[in-house]
């Protein structure tokens, strides 16, 4: 049974780290491109009432986050500042066939739609973050692997 020298083991571990790091970077880049493409395909433009980036196409983490904020603010304003809980409480106190109940149900539906849209946009923001983290980790692995491969007997 032959044993590997410590230097040979370091070189092998370095090679594995470089391979793993390269894979992390490649997969992260692919994920970033996929998320960006899907956001672009939706053809969403940040509306004029956005605090920043109004008129820009939603295609990156910043524009997706700004769009989510705008949706939240518009939904709250459209519901008169009411939350789902407020609307549910109000619905219990009115006749189900009244105009007020219809309006409350419309507000509830609008809040629900807005929550769904915001969740989708914030999920893309999170996916961008995970992708960037994985790419950074991959780059670190490549650097460490390179240093391990350069190790010599001194």
Where do the model's predicted regions map?
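N-terminal extramembrane/targeting module of integral membrane proteins
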Residues: 1-54
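Juxtamembrane interface at the cytosolic side of transmembrane helices
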Residues: 2-13, 126-154
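Residue-identity detector for glycine
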Residues: 14-15, 21, 30, 48, ...
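Generic hydrophobic/packing signal
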Residues: 18, 22, 61, 67, ...
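Amphipathic coiled-coil alpha-helices
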Residues: 21, 87, 101-104, 131, ...
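Extracytoplasmic/periplasmic regions of membrane proteins
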Residues: 36-124
């Amino acid at each position: 049974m032959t044993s590997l020298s410590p230097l040979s083991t370091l070189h092998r571990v370095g090679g594995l780290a470089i391979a793993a790091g390269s894979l992390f970077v490649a997969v992260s880049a692919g994920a970033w491109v996929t998320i960006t493409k899907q956001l672009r395909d939706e053809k969403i433009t940040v509306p004029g009432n956005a605090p920043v980036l109004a008129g820009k196409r939603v295609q990156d983490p910043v524009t997706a986050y700004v769009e989510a904020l705008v949706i939240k603010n518009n939904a709250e304003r459209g519901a008169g500042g009411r939350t789902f809980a407020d609307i549910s409480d109000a619905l219990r106190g009115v006749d189900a066939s009244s105009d007020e109940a219809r309006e409350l149900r419309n507000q509830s539906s609008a809040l629900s739609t807005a929550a769904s849209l915001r969740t989708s946009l914030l999920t893309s923001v999170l996916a961008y973050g995970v992708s960037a983290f994985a790419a950074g980790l991959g780059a670190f692995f490549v650097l460490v692997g390179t240093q391990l491969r350069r190790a010599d007997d001194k």
